[in-house]
From Swiss-Prot:
The keyword ATP-binding applies. One of its GO terms (molecular function) is ATP binding. InterPro entries: DNA_mismatch_repair_MutS, DNA_mismatch_repair_MutS-lik_N, DNA_mismatch_repair_MutS/MSH, DNA_mismatch_repair_MutS_C, DNA_mismatch_repair_MutS_clamp, DNA_mismatch_repair_MutS_core, DNA_mismatch_repair_MutS_N, DNA_mismatch_repair_MutS_sf. ATP binds at residues 614-621. One of its GO terms (biological process) is mismatch repair. Disulfide bonds: none annotated. This is DNA mismatch repair protein MutS. Belongs to the DNA mismatch repair MutS family. Pfam families: MutS_I (PF01624), MutS_II (PF05188), MutS_III (PF05192), MutS_IV (PF05190), MutS_V (PF00488). Keywords: ATP-binding, DNA damage, DNA repair, DNA-binding, Nucleotide-binding. It comes from the Bacteria. The lineage of its organism: Bacteria, Pseudomonadati, Pseudomonadota, Gammaproteobacteria, Enterobacterales. This protein is involved in the repair of mismatches in DNA. It is possible that it carries out the mismatch recognition step. This protein has a weak ATPase activity.
Length: 853
């Protein structure tokens, strides 16, 4: 790329470009030139690859051809969306001077910087998903983490204590852009993440952070926000706020507070648990067949985003949960009336953010007006609902009659996309604007009258009056009649078959019309800006209303889901345990064509661990996951897929279900499995719900069985967590005999020949066999292989008859059965050479063996 070392060698325009580019060296610069945004040098080469646009050359500057690429200004949003999705940031440089009055290059400046984490434009955002900017900080005591959704003003910070908790937060929030200090130590935590931005250390200084935050919120200290004693979180928040101010280059009135997220307030789920439970993303990275795909029938984008936040942060405050349950119950008979009205509210939350940033477009204001028009009907529908929480939401929604009437007066019904196109402000709102418009709009009548008058006066039937953007107004006469044009007709343009003229009267009117159009557009822009000034003082109340409407949408949605899917209202208990009657998996039951087999579950202080056995594909993993999902739904305040549920305190949910090689980090399947297991054993408590599936299968049989046994023992005896432990190691079914609080359950199956029928029904006691060969046959393994496997199984079973006898039907071997001691008689016989014995010695050996037996 050309540098600014020798600016004099460049043209004035390129000098201007290079100075601006030097201020933004690491991001693309969109440089406005007329109707295009141009990119030069390395930016042009990079953009041509990222956007698949042509790379050309523009003359020369400093003796070298200039690589150039460009995009039309009217299509800029589409190109920005592509770049943002690839993690790129773009500085938008606009012409702010008037080309008509400027000598040399038109004055330009960067008016905004578009980054993946700070976008607010509707075209760039996914409407049903939060778009977060985050900052991470680390010192010897732990991590600081802050997130901001600039499209709503939601500002959060936390202080994860360790690497695992920090990893879980990164997965939960999934930021579009992540700021980190240049000396950040745990680089493996953030490697491969999108939108990484390295920031200087001074941006994370605690004193600077406090000053920035107090300035933003208009406060003297941060005590009122409950974050005063969170120095690591504040360091991250300070850097984040500085970055937003640098990129947005405007005030941020919608960012009014900051909230501390504390671990003790919510059920903690690590990264593996969130992945395995497929809450909002399935294991393949998509959104099909996830919990959210079943539960999310919200009718507003902001409601959908709130529901997903609830799913990822289940709360432990039962007062909040009971209030949500009561609201859902009260709304179950009203959702058919409420949802069509709520649907009309749209994404008020993000419209308000654009209003705060002063980037709201005319159609945003029209949508805002439409949202406010729904409030009277919503308030009327909720007025007689006998529920205090519902009435609280109704009050928070507000009415905003004056603002609604203002927008009804000010903005036309279907405004254009951009205010610069004109025609946004409604007739009657401004008398002066109406006068300028009347003058401009009167041109059509005048031109029609002029055309008729001149045609009749001159007797020229080909005479027409018209207008184009290049030559302005003109009188056109065909080539055949052009010799009849009067002398005061001044030729303006010659065409193949016609001549175009101007007359003093038409020129005078043209100047008048163009002046009136310009005046009307300028006044309209001024009135539009004044609308912002009238709306922004009400921003805080409008944001409260948007939040209440989003929450109402979530709760109405949960009421509809509960009714439609036959969910029950769970009850909370102070005693540890989970009791589920006829529980179902919320996702699997929607996918299955046949009826889902519901199953019970009971975990209590005297029954803290269930050893779950049964065939592959028998439903063990489904049974375990449905328990976790029922608990998760209960702790967001939702109804749950069961006949009856009683649930005690839960502080964490852990899952160790399935694994795959982590090739990027050089970790095998077994290493991944053991890392997740170690995390559980270190962090689980007696109030944790733990799902352990097939521990130890990634190593040798004896190693795996020993590890599984020891893990189960530790969870049951030492940690005393509520545990579902699925295994194919039949030896673990002996655990209930050796320790208290452990019970066996199994999933039933019926085998007939080489076929197997899975009953998916949970029964007390251990499974009689694993049905592994039957499942292999079902999977299509060749018959000769199955036949050979059966032969080998019989051989293995015959080797250990004692172990086989301990099983119900002798089809499983006990690997931990004590090895038989070799008999002294056998040892003596092994050392005997019968061919060397005399008859007398042989007789003596018989008596000796008799004594050894």
């Amino acid at each position: 790329m050309s540098t600014i070392d020798n600016l004099d060698a460049h043209t004035p325009m390129m000098q201007q470009y290079l100075k601006l580019k030097a201020q933004h060296p690491d991001i693309l610069l969109f440089y406005r030139m007329g109707d295009f945004y141009e990119l030069f040098y390395d930016d042009a080469k990079r953009a041509s690859q990222l956007l698949d646009i042509s790379l050309t050359k523009r003359g020369a500057s400093a003796g070298e051809p200039i690589p150039m690429a460009g995009i039309p200004h009217h299509a800029v949003e589409n190109y920005l969306a592509k770049l943002v999705n690839q993690g790129e940031s773009v500085a938008i440089c606009e012409q702010i001077g008037d080309p008509a009055t400027t000598k040399g290059p038109v004055e330009r400046k960067v008016v905004r910087i578009v980054t993946p984490g700070t976008i607010s434009d509707e075209a760039l955002l996914q409407e049903r998903q939060d778009n977060l900017l985050a900052a991470i900080w680390q010192d010897s005591k732990g991590f600081g983490y802050a997130t901001l959704d600039i499209s709503s003003g939601r500002f959060r910070l936390s202080e994860p204590a360790d690497r695992e908790t920090m990893a879980a937060e990164l997965q939960r929030t999934n930021p579009a852009e992540l700021l980190y200090a240049e000396d950040f130590a745990e680089s493996s935590l953030i490697e491969g993440r999108r939108g990484l931005r390295r920031r200087p250390l001074w941006e994370f200084e605690i004193d600077t952070a406090r000053q920035q935050l107090n300035l933003q919120f208009g406060t003297r200290d941060l005590v009122g926000f409950g974050v005063e004693n969170a120095p690591r979180g504040l360091c991250a928040a300070g850097c984040l706020l500085q970055y937003v101010k640098d990129t947005q280059r405007t005030s941020l009135p919608h960012i009014r507070s900051i909230t501390m997220e504390r671990q003790q307030d919510s059920i903690i789920m690590d990264a593996a648990t969130r992945r395995n439970l497929e809450i909002t993303q399935n294991l393949a990275g998509g959104t099909d067949n996830t919990l959210a795909s079943v539960l999310d029938c919200t009718v507003t984008p902001m409601g959908s985003r709130m529901l997903k936040r609830w799913l990822h942060m289940p709360v432990r405050d039962t007062a909040v949960l009971v209030e949500r349950q009561q609201t859902i119950g009260a709304l179950q008979e009203r959702y058919t009336e409420l949802q069509p009205v709520l649907r009309q509210v749209g994404d008020l939350e993000r419209i308000l953010a654009r209003l705060a940033l002063r980037t709201a477009r005319p159609r945003d204001l029209a949508r805002m007006r439409h949202a406010l028009q729904q409030l009277p009907l919503l308030r009327e529908l909720l007025a007689d609902v006998d529920s205090q929480p519902v009435q609280k939401l109704r009050e928070k929604m507000g009415e905003f009659t004056e603002l609604r009437e203002l927008l009804e007066r000010a903005v036309i019904d279907a405004p254009p996309v951009l205010v610069r196109d004109g025609g946004v402000i409604a007739p009657g709102y401004s008398e002066e604007l109406d006068e300028w418009r009347a003058l401009a709009d009167g041109a059509t009548d005048y031109l029609d009258k002029l055309e008729i008058r001149e045609r009749e006066r001159l007797g020229l039937d080909t005479l027409k009056v018209g207008y184009n953007a290049v030559h302005g107004y003109y009188i056109q006469i065909s080539r055949g009649q052009s010799h009849l044009a009067p002398i005061h007709y001044v030729r303006r343009q010659t065409l193949k078959n016609a001549e175009r003229y101007i007359i003093p009267e038409l020129k005078e009117y043209e100047d008048k019309v163009l002046t009136s159009k310009g005046k009307a557009l300028a006044l309209e822009k001024q009135l539009y800006d004044e609308l912002f000034d009238l709306l922004l003082p009400h921003l805080a109340d409008l944001q409260t209303s948007a939040s209440a409407l989003a929450e109402l949408d979530v709760l109405v949605n949960l009421a509809e889901r509960a009714e439609t899917l036959n969910y029950c209202c769970p009850t909370f208990s102070d005693k540890p345990g989970i009791r589920i009657s006829e529980g179902r998996h919320p996702v699997v039951e929607q996918v299955l064509k046949e009826p889902f087999i519901a199953n019970p579950l009971q975990l209590a202080p005297q029954r803290r661990m269930l050893i779950i056995t049964g065939p592959n594909m028998g439903g063990k993993s489904t049974y375990m996951r449905q328990t976790a999902l029922i608990a998760l739904l209960a702790y967001i305040g939702s109804y749950v897929p069961a006949q009856k549920v009683e649930i005690g305190p839960i502080d964490r949910i852990f899952t160790r279900v399935g694994a795959a090689d982590d090739l990027a980090s050089g970790r095998s399947t077994f290493m991944v499995e053991m890392t997740e297991t170690a995390n559980i054993l270190h962090n689980a408590t007696e109030h944790s719900l733990v799902l352990m599936d097939e521990i130890g299968r990634g190593t040798s049989t004896y190693d795996g069985l020993s590890l599984a046994w020891a893990c189960a023992e530790n969870l049951a005896n030492k940690i005393k967590a509520l545990t579902l432990f699925a295994t194919h190691y039949f030896e673990l079914t002996q655990l209930p005999e050796k320790m208290e609080g452990v019970a066996n359950v199994h999933l039933d199956a019926l085998e007939h020949g080489d076929t197997i029928a899975f009953m998916h029904s949970v029964q007390d006691g251990a499974a009689s066999k694993s049905y592994g060969l039957a499942v292999a046959a079902l999977a299509g393994v060749p018959k000769e292989v199955i036949k050979r496997a059966r032969q080998k199984l019989r051989e293995l079973e015959s080797i250990s008859p004692n172990a086989a006898a301990t099983q119900v039907d002798g089809t499983q071997m006990s690997l931990l059965a004590a090895p038989e001691e070799t008999s002294p008689a056998v040892e003596a016989l092994e050392n005997l050479d019968p061919d060397s014995l005399t008859p007398r010695q042989a007789l003596e050996w018989i008596y000796r063996l008799k004594s050894l037996v």
